[in-house]
Curated annotation (Swiss-Prot):
PANTHER family: F-BOX ONLY PROTEIN 48 (PTHR12874:SF9), F-BOX ONLY PROTEIN 48-RELATED (PTHR12874). Residues 32-79 form the F-box domain. It comes from the Eukaryota. Residues 1-25 are annotated as: Disordered. It holds the Pfam family F-box-like. InterPro entries: F-box-like_dom_sf (IPR036047), F-box_dom (IPR001810). This is F-box only protein 48. The gene is Fbxo48. PROSITE patterns: FBOX (PS50181).
């Protein structure tokens, strides 16, 4: 008489447990991670539609997404060119220095926001440092302050006319 064995669906390896539920969960996780499933060109096209904050959040989602986003400089270039409208000199200097688009964005993003607020006159009528919002300051060189003061002067001249 032949011995028949029952098939064990819960095959155990020390430290791990593999069963049909684990396999199904792994399959679902893989299906949700489009970075691993789609061609890189398609993945980059999807990521290129994200704004700066969403792109940064996506890069923190998992290691695979972080690598895909961090290592593709073309995802960061359009955002750098957008802030270049406010920080042209700074962006151009960083390009000449050979920084990657991602590093250029990291170096200039906060400065561009602060500089834009100053240039647009948001802080024109501040009477005391206490009235400045927390993020109204960042290191700026003399040329940047010169641009801001020129913009203030132009606003004052317009008021007088």
């Amino acid at each position: 008489m032949k011995k028949t064995s029952k098939k064990n669906n819960n095959f155990k390896i020390p430290g791990t447990e593999l069963n049909s539920a684990d396999a199904e969960r792994g399959k679902e996780e893989s299906q949700r991670n489009f970075v691993e499933l789609l061609p890189l060109e398609v993945t980059y096209k999807i990521f290129s539609q994200l704004d700066i904050q969403s792109l940064c959040r996506a890069s923190r989602t998992c290691t695979g997404w972080n690598c895909a986003i961090r290592n593709n400089d073309s995802l960061w270039k359009p955002h750098c060119l957008t802030i270049r409208a406010v920080c042209q000199r700074e962006i151009d200097d960083d390009i000449k220095s050979g920084y990657t688009w991602r590093v250029i964005l990291l170096r200039n993003y906060q400065k561009s926001k602060v500089k834009y607020e100053w240039l647009s006159g948001r802080y024109s009528n501040i009477r005391s440092p206490v009235n400045l919002p927390e993020k109204a300051m960042c290191p700026m060189d003399a040329d940047t302050w010169g641009e801001i003061l020129d913009a203030e002067l132009e606003r004052e001249v317009e008021k007088l006319q």
